[in-house]
Amino acid sequence: MWRFAVFLAAFFVQDVVGSHGDPELHMTTPQIIERWGYPAMIYTVATDDGYILEMHRIPFGKTNVTWPNGKRPVVFMQHGLLCASSDWVVNLPDQSAGFLFADAGFDVWLGNMRGNTYSMKHKDLKPSHSAFWDWSWDEMATYDLNAMINHVLEVTGQDSVYYMGHSQGTLTMFSHLSKDDGSFAKKIKKFFALAPIGSVKHIKGFLSFFANYFSLEFDGWFDIFGAGEFLPNNWAMKLAAKDICGGLKVEADLCDNVLFLIAGPESDQWNQTRVPVYATHDPAGTSTQNIVHWMQMVHHGGVPAYDWGTKTNKKKYGQANPPEYDFTAIKGTKIYLYWSDADWLADTPDVPDYLLTRLNPAIVAQNNHLPDYNHLDFTWGLRAPDDIYRPAIKLCTDDYLGK
């Protein structure tokens, strides 16, 4: 049902922009990679709690780049909320982070968190089982990152990776590092945080609308959004779309796509011929529990673990309220921040007033405040290659060469 709804949204969007018949509408991430003449490889890894995650790899690019030690540096890219590995390759090769890093000589790995298009398997559970969806970004931070990064290091023989995360891909890394004893941090040479997430108290859009529409004690979230895989009921979508998009000059069908309702539908830096491809591959799925966790964060104003309710919290956490992730405890990994006032999700004032006040200045290598980036522009925007990807490539290259 969810994929059918996304297909309809993509069909209407492509009618608007006049881009009929793009083969990438029906391709997987590896197929998109191969379409542009790059090698693509697929790997799977099991998490400690049984989920089977699929990763996509571009082992090398079209250029003949050699390294002194004979090993290519590894960059691991982690998608954001409701997204997938495709985010890093859905623009043209000279516009997509995955291809640009590959052509610069990097071994590129693209992760997929549990519950998205590519990570829908479990050792014992099926997606039709409600227990399959009993998780939020807590478990992604605890299990998924560990499993994927460790597998990448095992396959490549490297002892560390360069990490580029977007949106939820930054939240999970921040959260994992905040509980790390130092053993994981040493595996992350540099952390490029695109649209970084700490507090989301002041966000706009879909999540803010529903979080503020109902009280924190409201217990009908799963009735509204459906149990298991996240799919808002039609009335809920229409209610949110009317409130959020009523005053914006956007195509109705584009606004009906829940991803744009969450992240912000207006952008002046998308390749418009690619919009149907964006809308076909995203949203890529997550659990309703994960969406509820995000809305709990809106109410909380910080970064709490999932709130199961007082009784279960006491069993799970040993206290009535969920504990908060302590970002002041992060150490050992250099972080490069990229954020914008125009972002609905990694917004102002949450980034400067919450995230930056908690990260130790000693680990914040760069704080890049970019003008006019919405939440999705960090992966799809046409200015991102010059503003983010190429500078990041140079930083990683110089670091790997010991400059």
Curated annotation (Swiss-Prot):
Q: Which InterPro entries match?
A: AB_hydrolase_fold (IPR029058), AB_hydrolase_lipase (IPR006693), Lipase_euk (IPR025483)
Please report what switches on or represses expression of this protein: Up-regulated by fasting.
The biological processes this protein is annotated with in GO are:
defense response to Gram-negative bacterium; lipid homeostasis; lipid metabolic process; triglyceride catabolic process
What UniProt keywords are attached to this protein's entry? Glycoprotein, Hydrolase, Lipid degradation, Lipid metabolism, Lysosome, Secreted, Signal
Where do the TM regions start and end?
Answer: none
Read off the Pfam families from this record.
Answer: Abhydro_lipase (PF04083)
Catalytic residues identified in the record: S167, D343, H375
Task: Explain what the UniProt record notes about the effect of disrupting the gene for this protein.
Answer: RNAi-mediated knockdown impairs triglyceride catabolism and further increases lifespan extension in response to bacteria (nutrient) deprivation.
Signal peptide region:
1-18
Which of the seven top EC classes does this enzyme belong to? hydrolase
List the Gene Ontology MF annotations in alphabetical order: hydrolase activity, acting on ester bonds
Stated EC number for the protein is 3.1.1.-
* PROSITE patterns the UniProt entry points to: LIPASE_SER
* Database matches in Gene3D superfamilies: alpha/beta hydrolase
Which top-level group of life is the source organism from? Eukaryota
Look up keyword Secreted and say if it applies. yes
Report the locations given in the UniProt record: Lysosome lumen; Secreted
- Provide the family line: Belongs to the AB hydrolase superfamily. Lipase family.
Described by its record, this protein's role is as follows: Lipase involved in lipid homeostasis. Does not affect global triglyceride levels in response to nutrient availability. However, in coelomocytes, specifically promotes triglyceride catabolism and lifespan extension in response to nutrient deprivation.
* Name this polypeptide is given: Lipase lipl-5
Task: State the organism named in the record.
Answer: Caenorhabditis elegans
